[in-house]
């Protein structure tokens, strides 16, 4: 059954708003630390292997989600419940469904590193906002969700606002890179990552809202199945370098912070798609880019211009338009009877019929 974000509250605050705020803060910190970990002075010849970072990210999520899921299981069944009674919930039933988004998310994470290594930060962030539109398209195709003209307009408005904000960075970005840049490779990687992001996010949302296993069990399954493509990437891409230099080559406190933030983001994203929806998650992520730009004023001598202010206003306007409640359909148009629990979930989220 679908869980409405307004029904679940923490100290009177709907969980969907708490999750979205957490995601915004997490993304803001992640963008700054991840970028700095790749351009940190003094580490030009000691860059960490990104495939190892992706694997550690999934391992951390696996441990955290398994611990919380097992704790909830014992709370519901009884503290005398054994671990072997919990394992069938993870590896039984329809757990195989999570192998699909697990593979997609692993590809997306690795493509992000490829894009970031071949594009300036601004170019990468601008192009990556296409995931908002791909998410909306896949929501329509897979969830049969309807978006009104105003919401479509807000999606394009948001994309334009983010583009304006980030384009001004093209003249101020430090041209630091771990190696030679190839714009064609970078743009190709980010475009494919946007398609994968939209498909994986919506598919995961459908699995979460259309089945019975808890959020934490689903995250355990997702992280577990992600380990296989992560290990395959390490073997195919960085095995010889890791064998020569070690698994943790180039690691420092900033790298670990970036990994922890990315792992925490995966958990927060799951909360967002459980209590809100995937497009709202993308709005939160986009707003966090603006916050990161503001933080760059103090950290990287970023200068606010009129262009930046115009972009901020467009993003705020787009967010207002998307979250504005739509008028309910007239009773004379008939009553929609959902045929599946997913139809009911879509109706709960978007108030469609």
UniProtKB/Swiss-Prot annotation:
One of its GO terms (biological process) is UDP-galactose transmembrane transport. It comes from the Eukaryota. The keyword Protein biosynthesis does not apply. GO terms for cellular component: Golgi membrane. The chain crosses the membrane at residues 147-167, 184-204, 215-235, 254-274, 279-299, 302-322. Residues 329-343 have a biased composition (Polar residues). It is a multi-pass membrane protein. Keywords: Golgi apparatus, Membrane, Sugar transport, Transmembrane, Transmembrane helix, Transport. One of its GO terms (molecular function) is UDP-galactose transmembrane transporter activity. The keyword Ribosomal protein does not apply. It is found in: Golgi apparatus membrane. Residues 325-353 are annotated as: Disordered. Belongs to the nucleotide-sugar transporter family. SLC35A subfamily. NCBIfam families: nst. PANTHER family: NUCLEOTIDE-SUGAR TRANSMEMBRANE TRANSPORTER (PTHR10231). Essential for the transport of UDP-galactose into the lumen of Golgi apparatus. This is UDP-galactose transporter. It comes from Schizosaccharomyces pombe (strain 972 / ATCC 24843). The gene is gms1.
